From Swiss-Prot:
Subunit structure: Monomer.
Gene Ontology biological process terms, A to Z: arginyl-tRNA aminoacylation
Cleavable signal peptide: none
Molecular function terms from GO: arginine-tRNA ligase activity; ATP binding
CDD domains for this protein: Anticodon_Ia_Arg, ArgRS_core
Protein name in the entry: Arginine--tRNA ligase
Catalysed reaction, written as an equation: tRNA(Arg) + L-arginine + ATP = L-arginyl-tRNA(Arg) + AMP + diphosphate
Record EC number: 6.1.1.19
PROSITE patterns, per database record: AA_TRNA_LIGASE_I (PS00178)
Source species: Chromobacterium violaceum (strain ATCC 12472 / DSM 30191 / JCM 1249 / CCUG 213 / NBRC 12614 / NCIMB 9131 / NCTC 9757 / MK)
Cystine pairs: none
Amino acid sequence: MTIHQLINERVQAALAAAGAPDAPAVVQPASKPEFGDYQANGVMGAAKALKTNPRALAEKVVAALDLAGIADKVEIAGPGFINIHLAPEYLARRSEAALKDDKLGIAPVKPLRVMVEYSSPNLAKEMHVGHLRSSIIGDALARVMEYVGHDVVRANHVGDWGTQFGMLVAYLVETRHAGDADLQLSDLETFYRNAKIRFDESEDFANTARDYVVKLQGGDEEVLKLWRQFVDVSLKHCEDVYEKLNVGLKREHVRGESSYNDDLPVIVQELREKGLLTEDDGAQVVFLDEFRTQEDKPMGVIVQKKDGGFIYTTTDIGAVRYRHRELKLDRVIYVVDARQSQHFAQMFTICRKAGFAPEAMKLEHVGFGVMMGDDGKPFKTRSGGTVKLIELLNEAEERAYALVSEKNPDLSDAQKREIANAVGIGAVKYADLSKNRMSDYIFNWDTMLAFEGNTAPYLQYAYTRVQSVFRKAEDYDANARIVITEPAEKQLAAALAQFEDTLNSVVEGCYPHYLSLYLYQIATLFSRFYEACPILKSEGEVRASRLQLAALTAKTLRTGLDLLGIKVLESM
C-alpha cells in the first residue's frame, strides 16, 4: 500500500468515527512544504453535508486519526484543512525498502490483460510526424502498464489493405515494374503518387485498380505476392523508425486491417441478425439513438457501402470482436488522434449493442492533440509539405551532436554520437510526453534541447550528476541505514515515495505527463538536496545515508526515463 493510500484509508476511518462515514478523505500531496507532506481536504465537504462547523469536525477527525509511526505532526489549518507531516524515521524505512527492491517498492497489482494499440501507420508510404505522438504515447503507456504488473499486448493496427494497394498493383503492372525484386519504399511512394494521378484522371485505370482490389480480396496469388512485397518493404521502414525512436513495437505486434478481411461479411451478417442494420440508399447502416444529427435524428454509421465494400469502421468492429473472443482482453486502449473521438465512440457503441464487447471489457480511446510549428499551425516543412519522421529524428541527432561537440570537444566521435542519439531522440520524445496529451503543443528545437528547465537533457544530466557522485565515492555501502534530519533530505525522500502513486495515476488515466512532471520534480529536489546537504564532504553515517538517498534518486530517474522510452547515460 502506498503512503497516499495508507493515509487516505486512515483519514476515511477517522471521518467515519467523527460521524461522516460517507465523506471522501480527499488526501493529496501538500502543495507547499509548510503544509506538511500530505493534506486531507475532505472535512470541508463533509461539514457542509452534515451542516456543522468544519473546524469542529476537523478536530474530531484529528482526535480519531491513527497515524502512529507514520506522521509526527498533524495540524488543522484554516477552516478545516488537515496537514500531515510524515515522520522522518518512517520515510527513511520506506526509502530503504524501495532501494533494496527491484521494483522500487511497488506492490504487485492484480494483473489485467491489457492491449495498447498505437502507431498504426498506413503502409506503402513513409511514416511522418503525424505518427510521432501515437507511437511514443502508446509505447510509454505499454511500458508503464507492463512495469506495474499487467499482461500487456502491444498492437500495431497498420493500414495494409484497401484501394491504395489496388492502385499500386495496377500502376506497377502498367509500367512493367511488377517484377522488380528490389523495390524501395521511396519507389513505392513515387509509384503511389503517380498511381493516384492516373486513378483520378483515367476511368479505365480506376476500374483496373478496383479489379485488383477484388482480386486481392479474393486471394489471387499473383496480386497477393505483390501485396506482400509492399507490406514487407513498408514494415522494414517502420522497424527502422521504431528502433531509432526507442519504441518497443516489433514485427510480431503487427496485425493489420487485412487480418480481419475474411470476418467482415460475417460481422455484417451478425449485425443483421441482431436487428441492428438498416439499408439506406443501398448501403448497410447502423443507426444510433445515442448520437444525433443536427436535425435531431439518429446518426447512421455505414458498415458496408452500396457497392459491397467495407470501411475502416467495419474493420475496427472486427478487431474488437477478435480481441474479445480470441485474446480475452480486459482493457483495450486506442492511442489515436483526438479528432477520431466520434468514430471510436460510435464503434464502441455498436460493439456493445452487438455483444462483440461485454461491459467487463473496457474500451478506451486515448486521444491527443496536434504538434504545431512556430506559426501555430500543424507542423510542416518550409514548403508546406509533410515532415518525414525519420528526417525529423535525424535532425534531432545532428542538432544534439553539434551541442555535444561544442560542450565536450575532446570526446571521441563515437562518444559524441552515442550522447547525441540519447539526447536528441530523448529531447523530441520528452517535449511531447511532458505535455498533457490532449493539448496541442509548439515544436521548438531550442526549448527541447535546452539543458535547463523541464526537458530530457536536463533530466539526463541530472542522472549523470548523481552517477558522478558514486564515481568519486570510494566507500559506498549499499546496506547503510538512511537517517533523515534535514528538510531537503525529507522533501526528497517524501517525493521518492510517491513513485508508485505516480505510476498508478498514469495507468488509470493514460497520461504519461504525470510521470514526466514527477521526474522533473525529483531532479529539482535532488539539486536542492545536493546544494543544501553535502554528500562527499560529510562523514560517517550522514555520508552513508546521503549516498543511499542519491542511489534511490538515480534508480528512480533511470527507471522513470526508461518507462518513457528515454535513454540515460552514465556520463555526458
